[in-house]
Amino acid sequence: MPRSQKNDNFIDKTFTIVADILLRIIPTTQREKEAFTYYRDGMSAQSEGEYAEALQNYYEAMRLEIDPYDRSYILYNIGLIHTSNGEHAKALEYYFQALERNPSLPQAFNNMAVICHYRGEQAIQQGDSETSEAWFNQAADYWKQAIALAPSNYIEAQNWLKITDRLK
């Protein structure tokens, strides 16, 4: 039974019903419907912390989905899973791929900045201030791009940029 048919919570059930209605109303191909079903099942599994299942669904959605914009969100979600698993290098790869297809994803820039900032903090703990500074500068660049796309978001990042004199 597909995950989308066994949702337990109200929000997932509501989303599934609305999505199914839209798929019937909006003219789409069978392939697009299948891709969306895998994507939806991936989101459901991801929200429950079932990352392996989510990845399987996302990879299947990627195999079927041809629209670059839709693919960007699949890639972004794969990046989120790798971030959650502490696989930061892999996460960055997927965020980059998402941005190649959709450069208007401020959340991808933000997540890349968070990873770079984390790596900068790690470098400080290892006593490597030069590497730390490089990571922090990279984080600043990504946060600036995220803020340019969503100026009212990422207030903590904006404050960090001001405090560290990287807002220029």
UniProtKB/Swiss-Prot annotation:
Function per UniProt: Essential for the assembly of the photosystem I (PSI) complex. May act as a chaperone-like factor to guide the assembly of the PSI subunits.
Cellular location(s): Plastid, Chloroplast thylakoid membrane
Matching Gene3D superfamilies: Tetratricopeptide repeat domain
One GO cellular component term: chloroplast thylakoid membrane
Spans of repeat TPR: 35-68, 72-105, 120-153
GO-annotated biological processes: photosynthesis
Pfam families: TPR_1 (PF00515)
HAMAP family for the chain: Ycf3
PANTHER family: CELLULOSE SYNTHASE OPERON PROTEIN C, TPR REPEAT-CONTAINING PROTEIN MJ0263
Membrane topology: Peripheral membrane protein
Entries under InterPro entries matching the protein: PSI_Ycf3_assembly (IPR022818), TPR-like_helical_dom_sf (IPR011990), TPR_rpt (IPR019734), Ycf3/AcsC/BcsC/TPR_MFPF (IPR051685)
Keywords, alphabetical: Chloroplast, Membrane, Photosynthesis, Plastid, Repeat, Thylakoid, TPR repeat
Family to which the UniProt record says this protein belongs: Belongs to the Ycf3 family.
Primary subcellular site in the record, as a coarse category: plastid
Entry protein name: Photosystem I assembly protein Ycf3
Provenance organism: Physcomitrium patens (Spreading-leaved earth moss)
PROSITE patterns, sorted: TPR, TPR_REGION
SUPFAM superfamilies documented for this protein: TPR-like (SSF48452)
